[in-house]
Design a protein with these regions (language model features):
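Residue-level recognition of single "structural anchor" positions
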Residues: 1-213
Length: 213
């Protein structure tokens, strides 16, 4: 809301819509609160920046499982698990899991190209520590899942849920803003896993974060 000419009433409505179970995109928000698409987009960018600030600071603890996944346009119907295509965005999904392997905290982060083997979707050996450093505390017990261990874990299902949410709500996202949407998804997922009250959690989030300009 810092330096904004948009009324507090419309900001409050935007927060309420974003905090709803369905969430909101810029097209929907512009129609709901009667502002230009550019204004709605700017409002949501600031609100999601607040979410990202919190989510980026929360690293996974305990036993952490992770896997390399990817988001690809629908026309890449022949996408393989090894070769990387130009439009694919490579994502590390990680979760703190209980003794039964069930996740209770989730992280999704874009993997920098320099951490990957050239031309592939695989982490380079020297890139693994940096990749885990983006999702887990240094003393976490970590495991990078591949092959049968990955298939038998909950991670593929969790990632597909996130992918469906992204496509349903935003109909495809460019790389520039993808991480902010991944943060939003994780915030929602982790809040639900904790059994938190959505209105209280979102109010606490939005009214404690410094201005984003």
């Amino acid at each position: 809301m810092h330096r904004s000419r948009t009324s507090l009433e419309k900001w409050a409505s935007a927060m309420d819509l974003l905090a709803s179970e369905a969430g909101v995109n810029a097209v929907e928000l512009a129609a709901f609160i009667g502002v230009a698409h550019s204004t709605a987009w700017a409002i949501l960018r600031k609100l999601r920046a607040a979410i990202a600030e919190i989510e980026a600071s929360k690293l996974l603890r305990g036993f952490v499982q992770a896997a390399v996944c990817w988001l690809a346009p629908g026309y890449l119907f022949l996408s393989t698990s090894h070769k990387r295509y130009r439009k694919e965005r490579i994502v590390l999904i990680g979760s703190s899991v209980d003794d039964g392997g069930l996740p209770h905290a989730l992280k999704l982060t874009l993997i920098d190209d320099e951490l990957l083997e050239p031309g592939t979707k695989e982490l380079a050996r020297e890139g693994i520590p940096a990749a885990f450093g983006s999702i887990a505390v240094p003393f976490a017990d970590t495991a990078l899942l591949i092959g049968k261990r990955l298939v038998q874990s909950a991670l593929p299902t969790r990632f597909k849920e996130a992918e469906r949410w992204l496509l349903r709500k935003f109909h495809g996202i460019g790389t520039k803003y993808l991480q902010s949407y991944l943060h939003e998804y994780c915030f929602r997922w982790n809040m639900a896993a904790r059994g938190g009250c959505p209105r209280i959690e979102w109010a606490r989030l939005f009214f404690r974060t410094p201005a984003v300009v």
